[in-house]
């Protein structure tokens, strides 16, 4: 009998008793009335703000405080007006009179909302040799740095802007006497604003904004109240999921796998943070839980013969043909089968569209690529970097997650758009590739020790003979290139489309989870702190 391997995974620190104990007073109607009043006041503030720079600062603050979804129409009208004026004014006015901060902020906000603004707006800040000129304006340089991350492939001016601003900010960081500016710079250098999770950014920015002498107290109060009210909804979502998880018996029956319900919920929350989309978060969390189990028996617990049969059963999708599977695989298959049918039933009932064949294909394809990687591992095969990535961007489960997100949030589902998405265009491929590469950077060392297929780092080292450090730099460059492709294909085409935003969020949650290592499989203090901040600890209103 073939000995089974173990991942030696740590137990979950989030038990059901603790999760069920979570409560919040912010479900009361009085808070909803208070929030509605504050939202009306903010709309007045937006309407009465007339100066262009004041408008840009206001929009930026609203976004970073995590309340912009309440003011989409108002923000869009302001930015449309700014963009139209920018197009008809002379070049000097377009450049905001050569003010680096204003030009950079305007560029970032307009691009973020899908407006096609040329990188040439930064030419007046460069010398004859094409280099950015040193300026004594750290606030402006920080704004330039943040703007540079909305670049697309081939935009060399923005590439120079990033190099210049990064170098300058690092050099000046220890000399800064303003503690707020220093903290902003330090955080930006860790991960730029464009690739941060909105909800976590809001927690941090609320604290920063509150310490400013010019803070607008109406914005601040709404941001705090909004965060606490949404947190109350997150608590209810997670409590429901914990009951579901316990009732399935999966934690006991699949005790070889990682028990990561709370972390799966954090993935779903990063994907879809909007309070009213709780059902979508529940679906994504369920899917993530099932993926983790399946991943762990393909990678570690299952024998090659077992996973070959399981892969075949996923292709057949027949619950009457499971006798050849061991018990743990029968349970996993039925959990996938029942969950898929439940999702398909809800959409058929609500929209009259049958997506069960779409879901079957997703799970069958995932099984195929998992099995390909398992054969690589068991045979000792080292794929080339290209061969690895052609399989691994799918095996990281990005397509499964993105399509379940699409089905969960799009109502009505556009069948032509769905057919287009099933060809795996950039809106599917690029976020999935970022997830794959970020995962490899964070987990490769531990997974190789446990016994897993070589990752992109090892494949590149084997292919080129380079060091691990050089391979990691290569993977980081691949991530950067892929993020630029995302900016072009997703942000510049569908910035206000809910699914476009969700696809961008997959890249963001990937960078977040693997920024300090394996923040999912081996949850570290940073993951725990973020979960506490988002789900457990409210923000003080006073």
Curated annotation (Swiss-Prot):
Catalyses which reaction(s): (2E,6E)-farnesyl diphosphate = (1S,5S,6R)-alpha-bergamotene + diphosphate
Pathway this chain belongs to: Secondary metabolite biosynthesis; terpenoid biosynthesis
SUPFAM superfamilies: Terpenoid cyclases/Protein prenyltransferases, Terpenoid synthases
Key words, A-Z: Lyase, Magnesium, Metal-binding
Residue interval(s) of motif DDXXD motif: 295-299
Cofactor note: Binds 3 Mg(2+) ions per subunit.
Residues bound to Mg(2+) 3: 439, 443, 447
Superkingdom: Eukaryota
Entry similarity comment: Belongs to the terpene synthase family.
Protein name: Trans-alpha-bergamotene synthase
Species of the source: Phyla dulcis (Aztec sweet herb)
Lineage: Eukaryota, Viridiplantae, Streptophyta, Embryophyta, Tracheophyta
